[in-house]
């Protein structure tokens, strides 16, 4: 299935699940959507936190398309699930933004680690959340983001359990793709990130960690949602964690070496 066909299936309601493992050679994107009045500070926030918030594209006020992401793409309908935040609280999850769209909304598309999973799989590195049919586990850490204006919050990380040799190989592979979070930020003891229980992720689903495996943590594009909550904007919208926007950008084009 091409990215365009995948987006069409989401648009007509045929697909509503997590997007990991779909359209493997193509990049997926996290979303943050907020009023134009706050967009400059949010852009500065992304630039100050590039590991967690690598920008793939920024829209014009009111625009629900970003040409660099896909020719027939519609931000309002092409994500399986959206989170709506009001005054810093998650108030609802919706499957379309048609009823909520405003002429002053600015879209930020941020790289997603699902993008490099295809390369890991091609190297024979198993991905437990895909194997178990679950959403990837994501955790809010105790690490503060670099603040920009009203935006702060804490770093969020995704976790994939890997054997030692696979973890080393994963570092080598993902280092080539800083536009989708790049190399892991931590391998091993989750308490060093302020994570007390790997079986209780704040976002996504817990996965099995087998004997001899290490938890490997990548900076995650859910991080902006902690910033949106921290800022307590009257309204802000994001993808539901794990339910991403499929783009026409090839993963190969994002490699820096």
From Swiss-Prot:
Tree of life domain: Bacteria
InterPro entries, alphabetized: D-Glu_cyclase (IPR009906), Putative_hydro-lyase (IPR038021), UPF0317 (IPR016938)
Record keyword Cell division present: no
Family named by the database record: Belongs to the D-glutamate cyclase family.
Lineage: Bacteria, Pseudomonadati, Pseudomonadota, Betaproteobacteria, Burkholderiales
One Pfam family this sequence matches: D-Glu_cyclase
GO MF annotations in UniProt: lyase activity
Secreted as UniProt keyword: no
Alphabetic keyword roster: Lyase
HAMAP family for the chain: Hydro_lyase (MF_01830)
UniProt protein name: Putative hydro-lyase Bcenmc03_3969
The protein's Enzyme Commission number: 4.2.1.-
